[in-house]
């Protein structure tokens, strides 16, 4: 077993290129291939300069090679990944899906990564999901420990219009559906809603998110606030630019909140600037979270194979 898992990146756009720079720093992942469909792609050109094997002939080319990757990161679009996913599985290649296709279980690193380290295909949900579902999870965790529930959570993700390429715009419907589902199934809210705003401001604004969670009126607010701070610190281990804008705000039940107590959390995400500009935190958190998931999968796989310590 090699000391690193051999990795292919499928897709050659902005997200794939930023992901490549992050994977190059990994102790457990070795990016060897980048696959696209545009021979003039800047992503493929950059990958070639960095020594990767590249092709503009898509997944067909990759799967025709004698030497195949252990792990694929796919950053194309939902419909493309839905078609490719069964082919990866048939070839014995594990996949980390950065599209909203949701073929495999959805993963938010602070919430449920350990549960899915052996899954053949995992989904990174959406940029808004990676930024906001950890907060919903933090609130639900604290409330559940007190014997309560979170009946409703709503997230609003505001991202720079400049950071939203054609893939993001084409996937808006999938974004809202996939993120809303994740707010419930991973965040733990009984009902969830997701809204994305493309901010046209110039100069571009960094990603900012608002998370509303309904909570029991008698919930321990200090415990909820501490749970939120703990999860933010965990996200910061792989997204250093992830931060609270201020302390969580608690409001008593009112007509405006449907008669429920509410905690509101404001976060912003500044990108690391590996390839994408720092204001594109919405894209950076996707690539950083995907790299985190890939590293943990690799640690587990290499440890089980005796190739490295977990």
UniProtKB/Swiss-Prot annotation:
GO terms for biological process: catabolic process. It catalyses: acetaldehyde + NAD(+) + CoA = acetyl-CoA + NADH + H(+). The active site is at 127 (acyl-thioester intermediate). Its EC number is 1.2.1.10. Keywords: Aromatic hydrocarbons catabolism, NAD, Oxidoreductase. SMART domains: Semialdhyde_dh. GO terms for molecular function: acetaldehyde dehydrogenase (acetylating) activity; NAD binding. It comes from the Bacteria. InterPro entries: Acetaldehyde_dehydrogenase, Acetylaldehyde_DH_C, NAD(P)-bd_dom_sf, Semialdehyde_DH_NAD-bd. This is Acetaldehyde dehydrogenase 2.
């Amino acid at each position: 077993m090699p000391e690193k898992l051999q990795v292919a990146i499928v897709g050659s756009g902005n997200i794939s290129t930023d992901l490549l720079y992050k994977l190059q720093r990994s102790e457990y992942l070795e990016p060897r291939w980048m696959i696209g469909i545009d021979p003039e792609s800047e992503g493929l050109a950059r990958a070639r300069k960095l020594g990767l094997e590249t092709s503009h002939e898509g997944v067909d080319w990759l799967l025709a090679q004698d030497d195949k990757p252990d792990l694929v990161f796919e950053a194309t679009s939902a419909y493309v990944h839905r078609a490719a996913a069964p082919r990866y599985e048939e070839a014995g290649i594990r996949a980390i899906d950065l599209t909203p296709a949701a073929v495999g279980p959805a993963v938010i690193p602070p919430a449920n990564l350990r549960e899915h380290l052996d899954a053949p295909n995992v989904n990174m949900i959406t940029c808004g999901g990676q930024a906001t579902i950890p907060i919903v999870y933090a609130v639900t965790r604290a409330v559940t420990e007190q014997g309560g529930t979170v009946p409703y959570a709503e997230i609003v993700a505001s991202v720079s219009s400049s950071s939203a390429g054609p893939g993001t715009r084409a996937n808006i419907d999938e974004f809202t559906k996939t993120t809303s589902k994740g707010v419930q199934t991973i965040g733990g809210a009984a009902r969830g809603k997701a809204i994305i705003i493309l901010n046209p401001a110039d100069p571009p604004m960094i990603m900012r998110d608002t998370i509303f969670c309904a909570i029991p009126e008698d919930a321990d607010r200090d415990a909820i606030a501490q749970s939120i701070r703990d999860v933010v610190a965990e996200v910061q281990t792989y997204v250093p630019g992830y931060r609270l804008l201020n302390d969580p705000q608690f409001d008593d039940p009112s007509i405006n909140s449907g008669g429920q107590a509410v905690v509101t959390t404001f976060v912003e995400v500044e990108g690391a600037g590996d390839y994408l500009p720092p204001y594109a935190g919405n894209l950076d958190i996707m690539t950083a979270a995907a790299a985190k998931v890939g590293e943990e999968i690799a640690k587990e796989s290499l440890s089980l194979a005796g190739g490295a310590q977990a």
